[in-house]
Amino acid sequence: MFNYTTTNLSAMPYAQAKVLHFEDGTIQLRSYATIVATIDREGWLSIHGLYSMTTRKHIGAFMREFTGMEYQTAKQIYTDGYQMNIHTGEVIPLC
């Protein structure tokens, strides 16, 4: 198991959401007890589910803070079954 540190979302410091920063550079968003988004060390963003309205707000805050993009981008890549590179904008099907 990788070691990681945990921080709050800047825009939602008291929310039931945590950002996990792994030693290898991977970043994950945990909303309540569920991992809902991952950015791997190469910049590939994957959204694992949209879940509740509150979790969607967490995803939106995560997107703005870590990608500079909005929730609608996360929703689109999730519903289309893609992952997106946050550095290049490249989009590929989920493996």
State where each predicted segment sits.
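Terminal leader/tail segments of proteins
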Residues: M1-C95
